[in-house]
């Protein structure tokens, strides 16, 4: 008779799976709560203690860690010496191991969890049995996921060796991810000696950045509730690779603001950001910032979408709209377009994201802390004769907040509640200045605008160009060996200039 070892934390589908195994000639061996669950369902089951002749001990820390279990799993069926050793020690082979792991990740999510409670949820016997079965998958089934039970029963009928190998790989992937979560809990150092990230595939994507590239979307085990990975899609086509990148960029910008805000993004750069007393007012500002570029854009709002705002957005082609919620009548209007993707997520009043970000390079990985630095008027040093007004200080702070989300070289022209022009990704700074001001001067709200730069001005040409296009105040990090030239140029034109000492490159 074949033997199956069952020891699961997640009892989903357990009884029906056990019955399926019995129907296929298996004897069931089980532990603790799993044994009780099966016995209560009237299923014949043998306890591990009866097999090993040794009781569970140390409050359940030692159950299956015994030669009569592990030798039965690991013995190679095609090796006469292995099989003779089993016979000599009266050990029966184990042909299937069904184990899922202690809920460590769920335990450490609890805000009140103690270290002792977390440690007790580190599974030892489960991963050991699973890995043993996976190592010997030429003969032994390793089952770690209740979602696979039906496929396993079918595979047993067909002696599906390919499925056994696939499930073995899944075991090693899951136990590796499980161990990685333990590592991160015990040592939350952002730059550890060994970096072991763990992600689970959410979905295969139609293609990557371009149609000839393949792609998939992976998520963390417990994504932050304000992250795109935690979003709920209510309507529209499946998200694409570019959609996901753009939406993530939009949310990163949106987190900067507590007042009603709307962010419009194209190709991971903002094309319009507006603030208002209402979300409709914020939309009006974001739209007016660049009515051309917003077409086909990704829109993120930090307040529920009402009918008035929805009716305005409905007039445009938009790829994605992300908000905390949609009023029923607003949703009805927006959902008339079958392709627009409507997502809900916790965006209201969320703080700037923390933690680290990674960038893959060929042969390696870069890790850095996120650029969470935000400058306020208190962080600004006036370096010119003319001092900025209070309204200009507000506008400078807003422009400075936006510029760190723009690809370098980055220039933002703005009022206190609206971007007017954005110059992104130019290889020289004056090129970005020209782009931003060309766009900004088309806006009816341009008078009195200010300008932000993500890095210092290497020469005074940027200030000269800004002055000739009626910029009234400038914010920049400073730090160039030619700072004096830019400051003198600002004084010459009567422009207020402040420095922050903080650069915001974005590559």
Curated annotation (Swiss-Prot):
Q: Which CDD domains match?
A: IMPCH
Q: Name one GO cellular component term.
A: cytosol
Tell me one GO biological process term. 'de novo' IMP biosynthetic process
Question: Which Enzyme Commission number(s) are on file for it?
Answer: 2.1.2.3, 3.5.4.10
Task: Report keywords, A-Z.
Answer: Hydrolase, Multifunctional enzyme, Purine biosynthesis, Transferase
UniProt superkingdom: Bacteria
Keyword presence, Transferase: yes
> Which segments of the protein form a coiled coil according to its record?
none
The record's catalysed reaction(s) read: (6R)-10-formyltetrahydrofolate + 5-amino-1-(5-phospho-beta-D-ribosyl)imidazole-4-carboxamide = 5-formamido-1-(5-phospho-D-ribosyl)imidazole-4-carboxamide + (6S)-5,6,7,8-tetrahydrofolate; IMP + H2O = 5-formamido-1-(5-phospho-D-ribosyl)imidazole-4-carboxamide
Question: Which SMART domains did the record assign?
Answer: AICARFT_IMPCHas (SM00798), MGS (SM00851)
Q: What Pfam families does this protein map onto?
A: AICARFT_IMPCHas, MGS
Q: Where is the MGS-like domain?
A: 1-144
- Which Gene Ontology molecular function entries are recorded, alphabetically? IMP cyclohydrolase activity; phosphoribosylaminoimidazolecarboxamide formyltransferase activity
* InterPro entries per the UniProt record, alphabetical: AICAR_Tfase_dup_dom_sf (IPR024051), Cytidine_deaminase-like (IPR016193), MGS-like_dom (IPR011607), MGS-like_dom_sf (IPR036914), PurH-like (IPR002695)
**Pathway of action:** Purine metabolism; IMP biosynthesis via de novo pathway; 5-formamido-1-(5-phospho-D-ribosyl)imidazole-4-carboxamide from 5-amino-1-(5-phospho-D-ribosyl)imidazole-4-carboxamide (10-formyl THF route): step 1/1; Purine metabolism; IMP biosynthesis via de novo pathway; IMP from 5-formamido-1-(5-phospho-D-ribosyl)imidazole-4-carboxamide: step 1/1
The UniProt similarity line reads: Belongs to the PurH family.
Q: What is known of its domains?
A: The IMP cyclohydrolase activity resides in the N-terminal region.
PANTHER family given for it? BIFUNCTIONAL PURINE BIOSYNTHESIS PROTEIN ATIC, BIFUNCTIONAL PURINE BIOSYNTHESIS PROTEIN PURH
Task: Tell me the NCBIfam families matching this sequence.
Answer: PRK00881.1 (NF002049), purH (TIGR00355)
Q: Which protein, by its recorded name, is this? A: Bifunctional purine biosynthesis protein PurH
User: Which species does this protein come from?
Assistant: Lacticaseibacillus casei (strain BL23)
State the encoding gene.
Answer: purH
